[in-house]
Amino acid sequence: MSKYDSHLKCSFCGKSQEQVRKLIAGPGVYICDECVELCNEILDEELMENAAGMGMGRSPEKNPPKAPPEKINFEDIPKPREIKHYLDEHVIGQDEAKKVLSVAVYNHYKRLSLMEDDDADPVADGIELHKSNILLIGPTGCGKTLLAQTLAKILDVPFAVADATTLTEAGYVGEDVENILLRLLQVADLDVAEAQRGIIYIDEIDKIARKSENPSITRDVSGEGVQQALLKMLEGTVANVPPQGGRKHPYQDCIQIDTRNILFICGGAFVGLDKVIERRVGKKSMGFVRPGEEGSAKEQRTAELLQHLSPEDLVKYGMIPEFIGRIPVIASLSPLDEEALVEILTQPKNALVKQYKKLLKMDSVQLEFEPTAIRAIAQEAYRRKTGARALRGIVEELMLDVMYELPSRKDVNRCTITPEMVEKRSTAELLLHPSSLPKPESA
């Protein structure tokens, strides 16, 4: 031991090496075991305070218990026809998927009302109503996510939308599957009882398909591993949800949520699934189609093949049998044709054309789309093969110069979008105010 060792002391409390049990050395600093223990206590207190702020508090003064959620009256439950009618006002086509969703939501309400009825025993006759989770399959831009978002607006139960692409198996970089429940909890204002009667829509579920049909010796942490992690949640379990999101750790208090009564709706494009069905059914495309009809003929054939979808096709695609078994209801959405894109532009309550008319009305300008221009926009969107999502991009390109110029022009009261403008051959036609027109010269 050197002559300097006896003078070593803790850089925080100042105690010498002889006064403490252990002195830990760092680059030019020292900390004793007592200070380390004190730091741990401070961190634990801070974690508890943060958890209390997120609704986990144990102090009745700071966090009074929330009132139980209002019971669902069976007579007030929206009927399937009413739910579908509301969806029809906002989403074009996809009648079969709308019926599936309407019935599923209605039955979900009925299960909740039966369990919340104090005078009724849900299993008095030995019959217990189980939930039926749903899988929506359809190409990109056909309305899967929009259907879910529209449903959320009319429901009296919490509705959350989650993305499966960010999920990974526990212990790896990414989000735990419990973060899906955290989104529902946040929508329910951190009311656990309210969240436990909610609905969750998991988008891009096809992205967690395992990379190979055969089991691999390497871990598939964002595919099969996520499916395995979701199994109990879909079926019904008591999950531990970290109130601040992220990964769970031993020093963090978790909120327990029972998922037995949470309805799960999953959606995905499942690109290439038609090829899997085709190999099983044995249907091959034969014959000829007229020039220009190749795309529509292929989409029609894909839609027909999806009508023959069976669970074994999804297993071949990469979904594990246990996962498919927990989603008994499967609905296919059709690709959007040109006619449907025209209707999407004009008919829904929140149609794109109506949105831009409202925008220009705020500048005291009346916006008009010629019918042939709307048809040209739909044709261009159909060529881009991204469904209804392409419509906003096309209209935004068309309106950029108009929306840039009009706020500075007080002499314009009408703007007309023509098919030539859609085809990039001309600019929008602007109609001037009568007071702004040049006066005719006197003879």
UniProtKB/Swiss-Prot annotation:
Keyword Transmembrane helix: no
Gene Ontology BP, a term: proteolysis involved in protein catabolic process
The ClpX-type ZB domain, residue ranges: 1-51
Binding site for ATP: P139, T140, G141, C142, G143, K144, T145, L146
PROSITE patterns (alphabetical): CLPX_ZB
Subunit architecture: Component of the ClpX-ClpP complex. Forms a hexameric ring that, in the presence of ATP, binds to fourteen ClpP subunits assembled into a disk-like structure with a central cavity, resembling the structure of eukaryotic proteasomes.
Annotated keywords: ATP-binding, Chaperone, Metal-binding, Nucleotide-binding, Zinc
Task of the protein: ATP-dependent specificity component of the Clp protease. It directs the protease to specific substrates. Can perform chaperone functions in the absence of ClpP.
NCBIfam families attached to this UniProt entry: clpX, PRK05342.1
Family recorded in the similarity comment: Belongs to the ClpX chaperone family.
Binding sites annotated in the UniProt record for Zn(2+): C10, C13, C32, C35
Protein name, per record: ATP-dependent Clp protease ATP-binding subunit ClpX
Record organism: Picosynechococcus sp. (strain ATCC 27264 / PCC 7002 / PR-6) (Agmenellum quadruplicatum)
SMART domains hit by this protein: AAA, ClpB_D2-small, zf-C4_ClpX
Annotated HAMAP family: ClpX (MF_00175)
GO-annotated cellular components: HslUV protease complex
GO molecular function: ATP binding; ATP hydrolysis activity; ATP-dependent protein folding chaperone; protein dimerization activity; unfolded protein binding; zinc ion binding
CDD domains the UniProt entry points to: RecA-like_ClpX
PANTHER family recorded: ATP-DEPENDENT CLP PROTEASE ATP-BINDING SUBUNIT CLPX-LIKE, MITOCHONDRIAL (PTHR48102:SF7), ATP-DEPENDENT CLP PROTEASE ATP-BINDING SUBUNIT CLPX-LIKE, MITOCHONDRIAL-RELATED (PTHR48102)
